[in-house]
Amino acid sequence: MEHSTRLAHISEDGTRTQTVYDHLAGTARLAGSFAAPFGAQSEAEFAAWLHDVGKYSDAFQLRLKGGPKVDHSTAGAQEAWVRQHLHTAFAVAGHHSGLPDGGSPADDPGDATLFGRSKKPVAPYDGWQEVTLPASTPPAWACADPLSLAFFTRMLYSCLVDADFIDTETFMDGKAAPRGSGTDIAALRDIVSAQAQRYLSAESPSPVSVQRNTVLRACLEKGAHGPQGLYTLTVPTGGGKTFASLAFALEHAAAQKMKRVIYVIPYMSIIDQTAAVFSGLLGVENVLADFSNAEYKTVEQDDLTPAQYRQMLASENWDAPVVVTTAVQFFESLYANRSSRCRKLHNIADSVIIFDEAQTLPGDYLAPCVSAIAQLIQHYHSTAVLCTATQPALEPLFRRFAPELHPQEITPDAARLYEVLRRTTLQDLGTLPQEEFAFRLANHPQVLCVVNRRKTAQQLYAALPAEGSYCLTTLLCAADRRRQLDDIRQRLKEGLPCRVVSTSLIEAGVDVDFPVAYREQCGLDSLLQTAGRCNREGRRGAEESIVYRFRLDECSTPQMLRQNVSALDYTARHQDTLDTPRAIQLYFNELSDLRGPDAVDKHGILDAFLRGIRGCQFPFAQVAEEFRLIENAARTVYLPVGEGAALCEQLRSGHVTRTLLRKLGIYSVSCYKDQFDKLDAAGALELRPDGSAILTDTSCYSEKTGLAMDVETGIGLYF
């Protein structure tokens, strides 16, 4: 059959064309393959065949020749709507502008909701009748309840927009877009298995290594033979859970024929360290580190310049065998509505997902986060592992969303492991004046101090001897943090003076070993994380390796930590020893009681889909705005320091690639709005269209203390 010559795209140089039919067919092939792991291949193909039928219109053909803008998405959405494919209608309507709110039957044709767009007049597109739509029925579970339908809609949307982007990219570039790069999962499993055997067969292992090997053996065994589902890995800090959890993940992915491993960590500040460890073992080509905060706002694809289109495509798609990302990126993407953030979602299906430091999952959003994890396990062929030294009390929430899911603990005897791996003694120092406390720190040749505020860290650092003192906060770019941590480890190894004042970024996955540590008032989980940086290798007795809990006269407890501090105080009154599974369980139960039942979904994310918002059904756009794990959204500032200078020039040139953004990630700092605005007002920033900026006044950045917290007339002031 001869197909219509109606065009979907014209190449940049004007010499090549792609017909609408060919674009629909290519997109359908890709979308179907993306949805196959969760049994929705026909639905994704159905959506893809409809998504651009509006391009058959005379109005759109005129647009390709420079005519006025035209809405080409609504036509396909209306075709899905009349066929009662609600999820497809959402996906097609939003495949450029983002998933819309559902709205209500009373909405007008001019409203941006799906109800409104279902009534919107569109230009005739009769030529689309050459398309034969495939038979399609969504999986029964996808329509079982509003939460499942909303999640399925986002996953379907992800398959559609990623397929659309890739087919368009392939045509524009004149060659197939590279996909699925990297080594086979089974081959990566073999690499990690070989390394594991070297650890297990080492001669004369230390007592700590013996226990780490116990954990590793359990991970290898469960990974290879355990069923797909929900697991916990409860291991004290310093128990080797990073490598052991990776070993579990690759064994399990190979056994269950899953596509990838996704490692979700709490802080962007340690992505570089975790990715470096994995890359050194598996090869850089197999590990994708999701560094960048940049999000490219979606607009009508046909209105983008070639440079803007390349920039949009540079956002990460998570198509590597091993992905390292943050909890913020992971969960915000799952509740996003923009194509730039959602196109990766289908690649979460068919994965092993490791949640490192699971106790840091955001309390105010805990219910929607657990609901999403439950959906992935139940319907999207994924396995989740909650990996932590301080296992939070999440079982009641999992019972609520997935009663048949029963967490399986990987560690054979967690209580025994905690007893054997106890390497520190916890003491409460009480309250001290800041000046007296700084003097106390200065008298330690080697010491770690973790505080709650960056300003406090700066002040204490300023009071320490210059030689061998360090200040670690998220105001430092990853490149400088890495350099400082290398210096710190070397000085500790050589027995040289090494005094470190840090914010909590050092508590998650940073491998350092101090003889003594201090932790400003906090929750039990944070206290034990700091303890994991003291006598980590067990070379000293626990009685001489003290971790002090303290308060400063001049510093009030941050509002967000007050319930955690109260829960720790309660636990300390009822337990003689705080570093045991029993004490940890008591702490999290008390914390849950203090927060109350509504705190786990403080912003009503789940209710928005269950009941709507002020009559608006399925409010995808509103929820995406509300679901912000970092309430005061951070902005990315790129730093022209070191290798970052040349990278910033490449960014200015407009030739943006994934590789460039990945490299720039370690020369960037995320800062909050007030700090960003002050730098901008001082003329220190070159603003970019995506909301990020390049620092133009390098005096506002110090390799020792990071980006200025305050500025006056363009001069950085460090506190």
Task: Indicate where each model-derived feature is located.
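Inter-Walker segment of RecA-like/P-loop motor cores
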Residues: 283-335
